[in-house]
Amino acid sequence: MCRHAFATCRSQDYLIILFIYVFSSSVCAGLTLDKYESDIFYWRMSMVIRMKKSDYDSIVRYCLDGLPNESCGLIAGFVDGDVKSVEKVYFLTNLDNNNVHFTMDPKEQFAAVKDARSLGLTMLGNFHSHPETPSRPSEEDKRLAYDSTAVYMIMSFMDNDNPVFKAFGVDKDKNVTEHVLEIV
């Protein structure tokens, strides 16, 4: 068993809120900590996103080739409980041709969805690059996150020799959860 305990204090009223969560050790690995404006903490489960090394390498190359602009695409695959397995990556055109935001070509999006359906795959989410900023959703990314079940993958090229690739979920209230990313 693993035990998580933490407290927060509001200076105005010295209110101490203590939460103790007891989970099996296999569940603890997938927990993330978030904070609301009210200073109340809570735990949320993250998903496991599984991707083949060859797909990861293809995304790195595609995004590097797109620098200094953001690159983007869609991912499709299978969902099995809390595991989303990426089976196909769709590389799409960034119509904005810009280094701080992207707009996917709608014709390419439609073709990708049509292809995924024909292969019996589920659309899992999207990926894009951050040429100069960290691998985390920007305020614009959160604002544009329309599907709380989608995976939002971001590759940062703050250091071109060491790109950082992370996967996130964004809920309806725009809270972000980092998912576990497995490259296999």
Where are these regions (language model features)?
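Short, Lys/Arg-enriched N-terminal segments with co-localized hydrophobic residues
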Residues: D34-S46
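Hydrophobic alpha-helical signal peptides and transmembrane signal-/tail-anchor segments
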Residues: L15-S25
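N-terminal polybasic/positive-inside topogenic patches
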Residues: A7-Q12, D34
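Conserved beta-strand-loop surface patch within small alpha/beta domains used
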Residues: R44-M123, E132-V184
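Short hydrophobic alpha-helical segments enriched in small aliphatic residues
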Residues: A5-A7, V22, A29, E37
